[in-house]
């Protein structure tokens, strides 16, 4: 194929795949290096964070406050919240770290953001699967009731993480101070993300307010898949899908608008 020739859709997909793969490899090597366990930190890092939280709940014997398995409760809330929080935090620095690569005509601003979010989602997903499998094997938690429903919830929240990453990156690109304080703001959002409570346990007025937050629907859905009908959940798949698509569209438009002013260095 000569330079300037029109590519087919299949060729464009192949090119896009190579671009994403190259950016992923560069990001992994840059972030984790080639020594010691290298890219294994991709999922060891979120796994360790979750491990410390689970052990804390285990040894304070949180089960005595509820008939619910509190380790399972933590495992079905905290890792998912950390996925979208970490993804949005990492998205902020994606452009500055890859400015020199934007000279290549096949590398776009959107690619750099997508790569970072994809890494965070992949790491969180692997850590979640491995840790839950280990906890089931050693008998600390029961096997999930509906794995497919849990996978659906995880996928929808991964989409939310990508959409949020686009929006946060775009806002931080326009206002530097926002990029510096988002880490703190996102940490403040954790208590209201549904990671540490069931909507059913809230007062009715608080329930109606909480259900306007997309991440609460994702957490409720994930927990419904794990606990089954033993718990009462209030998720709306339709609301979560519409919210994801709306946020994704908003994020794509915002990134497209500010990308025009990005100059490679």
UniProtKB/Swiss-Prot annotation:
InterPro entries recorded: ABC2_TM, ABC2_TM_bact-type, ABC_2_transport
Matches recorded under Pfam families: ABC2_membrane
Record-given protein name: Capsule polysaccharide export inner-membrane protein BexB
Domain ABC transmembrane type-2: 37-258
Entry membrane topology: Multi-pass membrane protein
Keyword Transport: yes
GO MF terms, alphabetically ordered: ABC-type transporter activity
Subcellular location: Cell inner membrane
Family note: Belongs to the ABC-2 integral membrane protein family.
Residues in the signal sequence: none
GO cellular component: ATP-binding cassette (ABC) transporter complex
Tree of life domain: Bacteria
The encoding gene: bexB
GO biological process, one term: polysaccharide transport
Record carries keyword Isomerase: no
TM segment ranges: 37-57, 64-84, 121-141, 148-168, 178-198, 235-255
Keywords carried by this UniProt record: Capsule biogenesis/degradation, Cell inner membrane, Cell membrane, Membrane, Polysaccharide transport, Sugar transport, Transmembrane, Transmembrane helix, Transport
Function: May form an ATP-driven capsule polysaccharide export apparatus, in association with the BexA, BexC and BexD proteins.
């Amino acid at each position: 194929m000569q330079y300037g020739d029109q590519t087919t859709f299949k060729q464009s997909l192949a090119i896009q795949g190579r671009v994403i793969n190259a950016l992923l490899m560069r990001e992994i090597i840059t972030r984790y290096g080639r020594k010691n366990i290298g890219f294994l930190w991709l999922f060891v890092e979120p796994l360790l964070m979750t491990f410390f939280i689970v052990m804390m709940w285990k040894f304070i014997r949180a089960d005595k406050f509820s008939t619910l398995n509190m380790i399972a409760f933590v495992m079905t809330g905290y890792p998912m919240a950390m996925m979208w929080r970490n993804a949005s935090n990492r998205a902020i620095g994606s452009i500055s770290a890859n400015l020199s690569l934007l000279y290549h005509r096949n590398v776009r601003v959107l690619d750099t953001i997508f790569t970072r979010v994809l890494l965070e989602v992949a790491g969180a997903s692997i850590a979640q699967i491995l840790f839950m499998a280990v906890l089931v094997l050693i008998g600390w938690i029961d096997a999930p009731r509906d794995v497919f429903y849990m996978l659906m919830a995880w996928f929808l929240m991964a989409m939310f993480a990508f959409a949020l990453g686009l929006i946060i990156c775009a806002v931080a690109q326009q206002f530097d101070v926002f990029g510096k304080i988002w880490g703190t703001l996102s940490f403040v959002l954790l208590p209201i993300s549904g990671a540490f409570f069931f909507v059913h346990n809230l007062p009715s007025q608080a329930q109606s307010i909480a259900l306007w937050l997309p991440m609460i629907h994702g957490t409720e859905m994930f927990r419904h898949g794990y606990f089954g009908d033993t718990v009462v959940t209030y998720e709306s798949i339709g609301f979560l899908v519409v919210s994801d698509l709306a946020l994704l569209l908003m994020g794509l438009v915002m990134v497209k608008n500010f990308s025009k002013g990005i100059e490679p260095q």
